[in-house]
Amino acid sequence: MIVWLASYPKSGNTFVRALLTSYFFCNNGILDFKLLNSISVFPQELIFKKFGVDIYNEREVLKNYVRIQKLINKQNSIQFIKTHSALFNIEGKYPFTNLDASLGAIYIVRDPRNVITSYAHHLSVSPKETKDIMIKNHKGSSGENNSLFTYIGSWGDNFNSWKSFKYQQKKASKGRAWYKTKVVGKKESSPFKRQ
């Protein structure tokens, strides 16, 4: 099952991936940057190509989001997957994901004033231009190699969309567990074991 590592761009997702990679995929907790890709990115063109989706047809990619996630889940293991996508129906009809395709989510929040500075540098634009980008719905690349366009939304919409993915909804969904972290470092419970 998928555990989403979701965030608005430049909010620390790669840092959290590095922590999780050190804990779950590296020997003795020492980060090996080659293993950072143990946590993949969604949407990513390689996985869509693998399952026969025309990556040059945006509608085909969108229509296959949930199907691809269900195919990923056939691996029958817990997988962390990074995304900057907002959790909504794109164009009102293409869901990013659903409760059946996801075990849970970790949403990484960074003060948007700090995001502006970092994102402006990343985009090579002024902080004012970045602020304008962040308050509009937009799509962009995750910044990873071979990533498809991601429907990011505004900073507020991105944050609120993931905030609305409720613990109670998942808990009631077919008896599967949904794990919610209240405070960083204080877990209610965890399905993960260190390798």
What are these regions (language model features)?
Residues 1-169:
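PAPS-dependent sulfotransferase catalytic domain
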Residues 6, 165-195:
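Phosphate-binding beta-loop-alpha motif at adenosine-nucleotide cofactor sites
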